[in-house]
Amino acid sequence: AEAKFIEAEVRLLQNGGKGNPDAYNAYLDGIRANMTKIGVSAANITAFTSNPKIAVGAENLTISQIISEKYKALFLNPEAWTDLRRYDYSNTILPGLSLPANHNPDLKGKWIQRAAYPTSETSRNSANATQNFRDLDVKMWIFN
């Protein structure tokens, strides 16, 4: 599923961000692959992928639709967090995305960008861990 969503995103971006049959087919294949993996019946997969909110047609496919379905497929997987950071937590990409109610007050209203070093790292390798420490809201180099 993940590979198909990556393919859909690449095909869309290669076409200037415009929907096209290759991107659309990969998007639908990603949805089907994920639903099959989690045990959804063929009839329910067909019903879901036939829903007008999903079956938008090749020319109407957007990056938002691809990333939204990829997020569902990868929920609780670190790659989903990578996509959120790649797209700067955009609620244009993931409509309705907002900071959680009990957001970490140390982040001062900013999204988390990196994980903290584990205690084992700071206790066993404190010189390097403290030298390379960045606040959790500082973007990693790859997302700048």
Regions found by a protein language model. Name each.
Residues A1-N144:
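Acidic/polar-rich alpha-helix caps and helix-coil junctions
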